[in-house]
């Protein structure tokens, strides 16, 4: 099978890159092994939430994105943002904002500055873009609603309203609020309660989506809110989009918000579903349940790859994009004595002091400190071309968290790196 572009990985980075390429008339295939990290994510995207930790482990919160992305180059020269340059990073971030609006992802936020989003435990976390159904505040501004009801679902343990309510008022932006907690009694879910393993957000949303007892659910929310102006609910209402939540909001006449639960996350899954629909509607091909095994090279180019299900048939392309993610999605593999990228055997880099073949450099003794192994990934240049044996391959690019030289967990930049590098690589390929 021959394509213009073959992308390995169907997560946020792979789908974003694929959409941008398909929109310009190229023939693209995505080899997707299964669920991606986006399926377990909060639905909020971070461009850069924190600067690198100081020597004593203290992190520095980012508010002004442009200023801090520019400053990042001095502290982490191998970070993808440093390689691309602040101007290009912000331009690609704005391109993604336009794409998100086009796809009706219902995201709020901008590259001007970060905002705070409420987490499932009641703390505040910096974000670049968040679903408009998630409660957010700007800087030190007070939350606009004074009386808040946090409502869980009886028998559903992936969302704890009492804990969230107690933590929420500890934040200065919510100190003025009167926060109560309670549970919704939804008889339609009794069948799921018989098996705790099936009582998850996805199963709940699938059952409720038919709206067989919609009026009863509306009545239960109104009664349980006890006169509150705003209601915080677990993200269990509407699998593919926000239409169910919008219908509930209109029917209850309340300010309804949803919060991410323990994974799998409905908010992240919605985004992947919408991105995939867009990619396929543009004519892109998704090969699901398959994984790339190895590659054949000709000089400094990749000629083809072989996959697990199509091992007798080569996939050839003019350009290849590695969007396989980090350890979570097996884009990187860790063995006792080495960390490696399994498909192309690309060169691996990390933060200063990290050595992929020296296990003692992978961790630091303080558990809560950023761990060096989390910065491992493939080496790239300013065009996001992948390095192998010290040489950059001319038709192999890397996007997202498979790239090394930065710790996405420490910096809060994983989603930003995914979409920025994806759109930058799409531009590089289309310019050829």
From Swiss-Prot:
Single GO molecular function: glycerol-3-phosphate dehydrogenase (quinone) activity
Native organism: Haemophilus influenzae (strain PittGG)
Assembly notes: Composed of a catalytic GlpA/B dimer and of membrane bound GlpC.
UniProt GO BP: glycerol catabolic process
UniProt-listed Enzyme Commission number(s): 1.1.5.3
Descriptive protein name: Anaerobic glycerol-3-phosphate dehydrogenase subunit B
Alphabetic keyword roster: Flavoprotein, FMN, Oxidoreductase
GO CC annotation: glycerol-3-phosphate dehydrogenase (FAD) complex
